[in-house]
């Protein structure tokens, strides 16, 4: 066991593997990507459209103007992050570009800086503030552009496969080359529409000579092989065939006949070069369809005819059409990534091409790379892809799998915003062009008026506000925040559709190892589509996920760290990080298990090429916080990972006694801690700020040139609301005079303790059934947890109201509210706004507001009052902001925004008032508790502590769990955690047990027995075979339970699913406008839906009157429910119900589809149902 520093705490770690590199910056992908967009991305987009000329036609080029973008400058944010949150603003920076305009006729030029617009700016916590709300842009996993060799799904069984080479661009038409083995012919499918003969396309691309075409697909026939020779009839000879004596048997271009086969069989010739059967068949089919005289122009016209039937084929139009599809950079873009992937994939085919077609030797082509740089397709790409299809026919195992991570790339924040910016700017380019054309001289041009800033800003803003990849940040706790920033999603624009995603896409793939977590993913419809990055994973310049490995040479581990993509990793044998290694770095065992491709092999240590860097390399941050993960079933580990993100920050935080060593890393990069920016000495600490005097490398205090001390001031956040209504409160954890190093924690945030993540509490648990109160995952808890406020959390709700201009005059914020008692107004100030510190309950007034009433219904008496008292006598309606049902708490802040002082608040709004109420939520029956192993349950009873089972020394346990929750769930990690937690408490230590490299049973139980023996708690356990169990006594009777019981300390969290927030009841409330039925849901103060199954239940009982009431007066019979109310008030019998509104709606809908529906009474008179 070794000591490790974790935040400001020391832990004892059971880990045996020392990772050669530290955990990387966990949010670096976001920051780097956005920074790259600002520094390079914007300019790249502008350069892409440069130069913009005033006229498209080449004739006037020398006369017009051309505009190009020289550089980009990013300004400073105008408001602070906190101001933007309070005033519901967007945190942005201004972007400027230097524009150069040249007069083409005189070559005169002007340079001027123009404003491009405001761009949302990333905060230091890698979030964006959009209209006051913190949002995160999630990384998207999409198919990489390039080339894929796949098999088309077979339509009927018994047919032979169709192999496809699929060119996938970033932008533009698809091209698919097909090898149909049913008729052994090559085809090209153009733009997912029509299939044409491949040779027709190749002829259009310049391969017009038939023999030249066939010689692209050569094959050697062994004359000694009788079977092959007999089956070569009909093939075309590609080289003159001569005997050793020089006699010419067959010329280049001859077709092999039966006679030639006999001649060849009787000669001494060993091999002949012929065209491949598939190529010959393709050419024959082409001739059969189009005749013998297909040259380049004819090929263009035939392709055009096929793709545009009905249009008159002209040669120029046909050429332009095909060139625009695949060979024009404006219409077709492979991108740098696509070209890189394609060159890599076709490298082997290119070498084979050089040997077969160009006659080079294997030695000459060894190591030769395919180095095409064009951003569009080339004829060579198409030839190599077609030739490779023949190889795929021979070796189907070399086909590509779509689900391999080597074929997927990550679109990061910067790239997603760049795509939007490019889209916005492409629209602006046309306007710039049009405006340029209107100017006649250079000195009259106003650069700023050329660029339409509005359309650019609008597109960017709509991306942040409406794109599914820009998400409202999950801020429940620091881990939720960190995980959200590291999320990968396969859905969204340009990605998969949730409904259409196959099982294979969602499944774990061997290429995910070390790149994507195989455990952390949602449980619902999104399972496998939304995932999380692994701890050490990062992204290369092309957007492919890479993960680090340690290089191994001849059985010895080196210091070299190599990052590999999923494609590169396929070629190496990689051993796990837990492989035993001696002090010199030599691998100890002679044979080692390694991963190679998708197999696990057992090889000599000298064959090992790489070693994993850490045992937790495979999992995400959330999952690597689960101790004893290796003892949990993956399904439960998934729940554990997801539920940690739902833990509510508690009033008093407590780090887990049994951690994994990742608690500090998770808290550090979550952005909720305050970290020291430089080395220094703490000079001042209070609840709101910390001041640190900087020191140099020698520990001396630093002063500036004026002799003033160089101070760093850290402002702390106090009781700030998060997106999920939890509370952010930062507390100092340093003292005056303390020396701090750079990146040391100096203040704790929500759910952190001494710099470590602290989502729950260490509580004493016992696994024993107790009177059925812990049946089916229910949890029995002790009153002690309430007395100590163990699971009490603070939540902050915000309520707002506006004073607007109405038709009848402005609304007024005032304490003078009609028909409200003084008692109700006692906490309002002179403006009618609640005072800070007031304790409020449901229906209390937070902001007094009155709205002018309509003049039409004034009585003569009111008119007299009006004429006497003027405006004061005006009738007003109470429209005050009140506390909603089920809420009680303390007002902690009030923000008032005035139109005159704070600028525009929106159309017609004069005042905006926001009231923040802090609500204390102790643990109650119905709240959800969970451990870190997917062991979740609901509190069923709170028992007095004297009734709880107790230990031999009289200590009552705090939580009683059902032992039946463990065996079937197979999350045994919780049992080991419980025992190690007890050992930690007894010895007052903090342990770290890293995932896949943690403590073993033999490390825990003997030590636990010794610690218990010292305190007399060993009753019920055996020294020779310790189990960690203890004899418990029932708190009510004092009698021992029949068997020893497992007891210990488990880390338990309170989740955001709080019963108090969900409980709801309605007697009377709002109704839906159309059907006049009660609304649904707590937010609308709605009722419970009485659905068809409930109707069946009442029908089964024969409760006719109850059923009638349910479907009419209690639902949507408007007149009926009013009559019932009157009858109840007057004490009369309840009248018969009328016609439900839903029936009227049905009749109206039938009339809407032109069906004339009428209603008649028993005597045949028509009834107007609107009056019923």
UniProtKB/Swiss-Prot annotation:
SUPFAM superfamilies in the cross-refs: beta and beta-prime subunits of DNA dependent RNA-polymerase
One Gene Ontology biological process: DNA-templated transcription
Keywords: DNA-directed RNA polymerase, Nucleotidyltransferase, Transcription, Transferase
Reaction catalyzed: RNA(n) + a ribonucleoside 5'-triphosphate = RNA(n+1) + diphosphate
GO molecular function: DNA binding; DNA-directed RNA polymerase activity; ribonucleoside binding
EC number: 2.7.7.6
Record's GO cellular component terms: DNA-directed RNA polymerase complex
InterPro entries with a match to the protein in the record: DNA-dir_RNA_pol_bsu_ext_1_sf, DNA-dir_RNA_pol_bsu_external_1, DNA-dir_RNA_pol_su2, DNA-dir_RNAP_su2_dom, DNA-dir_RNAP_su2_hyb_sf, RNA_pol_bsu_bac, RNA_pol_bsu_CS, RNA_pol_bsu_protrusion
Function description: DNA-dependent RNA polymerase catalyzes the transcription of DNA into RNA using the four ribonucleoside triphosphates as substrates.
HAMAP family reported in the protein's UniProt record: RNApol_bact_RpoB
Subunit structure: The RNAP catalytic core consists of 2 alpha, 1 beta, 1 beta' and 1 omega subunit. When a sigma factor is associated with the core the holoenzyme is formed, which can initiate transcription.
Family designation: Belongs to the RNA polymerase beta chain family.
Name of the protein in its database record: DNA-directed RNA polymerase subunit beta
Origin species: Thermosipho africanus (strain TCF52B)
């Amino acid at each position: 066991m070794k000591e490790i520093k974790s935040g400001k705490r020391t832990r004892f770690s059971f880990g045996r593997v020392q990772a050669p590199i530290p955990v990387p910056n966990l949010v670096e992908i976001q920051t780097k990507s956005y920074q790259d967009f600002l520094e390079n991305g914007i300019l790249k987009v502008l350069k892409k459209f440069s130069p913009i000329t005033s006229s498209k036609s080449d004739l006037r080029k020398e006369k017009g103007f051309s505009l190009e973008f020289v550089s980009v400058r990013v300004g400073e944010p105008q408001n602070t992050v906190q101001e933007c949150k309070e005033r519901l603003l967007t945190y942005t920076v201004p972007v400027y570009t230097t524009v150069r305009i040249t007069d083409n006729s005189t070559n005169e030029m002007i340079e001027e800086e123009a404003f491009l617009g405001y761009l949302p700016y990333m905060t230091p916590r890698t979030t964006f503030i959009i209209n006051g709300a913190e949002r995160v842009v999630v990384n998207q996993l999409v198919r990489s552009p390039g080339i894929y060799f796949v098999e088309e799904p077979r339509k009927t069984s018994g047919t032979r496969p169709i192999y496809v080479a699929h060119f996938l661009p970033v932008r533009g038409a698809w091209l698919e080359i097909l090898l149909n083995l049913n008729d052994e012919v090559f085809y090209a499918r153009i733009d997912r529409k029509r299939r044409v003969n491949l040779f027709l396309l190749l002829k259009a691309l310049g391969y017009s000579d038939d023999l030249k075409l066939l010689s692209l697909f050569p094959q050697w026939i062994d004359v000694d092989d009788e079977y092959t020779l007999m089956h070569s009839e009909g093939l075309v000879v590609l080289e003159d065939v001569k005997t050793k004596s020089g006699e010419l048997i067959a010329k280049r271009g001859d077709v092999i006949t039966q006679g030639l086969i006999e001649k060849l069989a009787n000669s001494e010739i060993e091999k002949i070069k012929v065209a491949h059967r598939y190529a010959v068949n393709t050419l024959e089919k082409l001739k059969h369809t189009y005749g013998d005289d297909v040259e380049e122009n004819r090929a263009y016209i035939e392709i055009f005819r096929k793709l545009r039937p009905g249009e008159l084929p002209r040669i120029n139009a046909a050429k332009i059409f095909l060139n625009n599809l695949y060979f024009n950079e404006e219409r077709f873009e492979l991108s740098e990534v696509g070209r890189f992937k394609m060159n890599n994939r076709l490298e082997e085919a290119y070498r084979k091409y050089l040997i077969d077609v160009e006659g080079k030797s294997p030695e000459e082509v060894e190591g030769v790379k395919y180095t095409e740089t064009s951003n569009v397709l080339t004829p060579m790409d198409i030839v190599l892809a077609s030739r490779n299809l023949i190889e795929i026919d021979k070796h189907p195992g070399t086909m590509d799998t779509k689900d391999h991570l080597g074929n997927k790339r990550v679109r990061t924040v910067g790239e997603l915003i760049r795509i939007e910016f490019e889209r916005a700017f492409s629209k602006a380019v046309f306007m710039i062009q049009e405006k340029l054309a209107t100017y006649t001289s250079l000195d009259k041009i106003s650069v700023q008026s050329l660029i339409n800033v509005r359309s650019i800003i609008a597109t960017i803003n709509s991306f942040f506000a409406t794109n599914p990849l820009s998400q409202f940040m999950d801020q429940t706790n620091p881990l939720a925040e960190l995980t959200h920033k590291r999320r990968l999603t396969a859905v969204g624009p340009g990605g998969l559709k949730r409904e259409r995603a196959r099982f294979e896409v969602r499944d774990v793939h061997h290429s995910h190892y070390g790149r994507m977590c195989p455990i952390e993913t949602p449980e619902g419809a999104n399972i496998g589509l939304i995932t999380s990055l692994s701890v050490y994973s990062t992204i290369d310049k092309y957007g492919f996920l890479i993960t680090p490995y340690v290089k191994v040479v001849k059985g010895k581990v080196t210091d070299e760290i190599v990052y590999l993509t999923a494609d590169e990793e396929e070629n190496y044998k990689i051993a796990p990080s837990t492989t035993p290694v001696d002090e010199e770095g030599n691998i100890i065992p002679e044979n080692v298990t390694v991963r190679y491709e998708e197999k696990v092999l057992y090889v000599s240590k000298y064959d090992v090429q790489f070693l994993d860097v850490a045992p937790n390399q495979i999992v995400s941050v959330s999952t690597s916080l689960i101790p004893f993960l290796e003892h949990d079933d993956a399904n439960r580990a998934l729940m554990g990972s997801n539920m940690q993100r739902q833990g509510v920050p508690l009033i008093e935080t407590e780090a887990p006694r049994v951690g994994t060593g990742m608690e500090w890393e998770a808290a550090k990069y979550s952005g909720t801690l305050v970290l020291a920016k430089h080395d220094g000495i703490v000079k001042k600490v209070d609840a709101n700020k910390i001041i640190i005097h900087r020191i140099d490398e020698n520990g001396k205090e630093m002063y500036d040139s004026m002799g003033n001390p160089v101070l760093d001031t850290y402002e702390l956040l106090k009781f700030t609301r998060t997106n999920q209504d939890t509370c952010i409160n930062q507390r100092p954890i340093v003292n005056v005079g303390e020396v701090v190093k750079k990146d040391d924690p100096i203040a704790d945030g929500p759910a952190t303790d001494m710099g470590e993540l602290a989502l729950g509490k260490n509580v004493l648990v016992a696994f024993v059934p107790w009177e059925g109160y812990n049946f089916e995952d229910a949890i029995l808890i002790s009153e002690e947890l309430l007395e100590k406020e163990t699971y009490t959390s603070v939540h902050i709700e915000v309520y707002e109201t506006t004073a607007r201009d109405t038709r009848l005059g402005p609304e007024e914020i005032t304490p003078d509210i009609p028909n409200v008692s003084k008692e109700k107004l006692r906490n309002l100030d002179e403006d009618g706004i609640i005072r800070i510190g007031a304790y409020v309950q449901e229906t209390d007034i937070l902001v007094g507001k009155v709205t002018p009433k309509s003049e039409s219904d004034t009585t003569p008496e009111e008119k007299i009052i009006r004429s006497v008292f003027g405006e004061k006598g005006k009738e007003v309606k109470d429209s005050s902001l009140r506390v909603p049902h089920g809420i009680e708490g303390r007002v902690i802040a009030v923000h008032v925004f005035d139109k005159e002082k704070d600028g525009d608040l929106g159309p017609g709004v004069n005042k905006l008032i926001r009231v923040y109420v802090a609500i204390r939520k102790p643990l109650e029956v119905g709240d959800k508790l969970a451990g870190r192993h997917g062991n979740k349950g609901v509190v069923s009873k709170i028992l007095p502590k004297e009734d709880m089972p107790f230990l031999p020394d009289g200590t009552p346990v705090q939580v009683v769990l059902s032992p039946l929750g463990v065996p079937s769930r197979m999350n045994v990690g919780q049992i080991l955690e419980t025992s190690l937690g007890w050992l930690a408490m007894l010895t007052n230590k903090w342990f770290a047990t890293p995932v896949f490299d943690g403590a073993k049973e033999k490390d825990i139980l003997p030590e636990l027995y010794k610690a218990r023996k010292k305190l007399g708690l060993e009753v019920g356990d055996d020294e020779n075979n310790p189990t960690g169990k203890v004899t418990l006594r029932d708190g009510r009777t004092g009698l021992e339970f029949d068997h020893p019981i497992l007891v210990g300390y488990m880390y338990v969290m309170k989740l955001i699913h709080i019963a108090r927030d969900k409980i709801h009841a309605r007697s009377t409330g709002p109704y839906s406008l159309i059907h006049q039925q009660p609304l649904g849901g707590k937010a609308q103060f709605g009722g419970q839906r009485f659905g068809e199954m409930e109707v069946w239940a009442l029908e089964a009982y024969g409760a006719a009157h109850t059923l009638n009431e349910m479907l009419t007066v209690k639902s949507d019979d408007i007149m009926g429910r009013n009559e019932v109310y009157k009858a109840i008030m007057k004490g009369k019998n309840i009248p018969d119900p009328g016609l439900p509104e839903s029936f009227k709606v049905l009749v109206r809908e039938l009339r809407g589809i032109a069906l004339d529906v009428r209603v008649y009474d028993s005597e045949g008179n028509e009834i107007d149902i609107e009056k019923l």
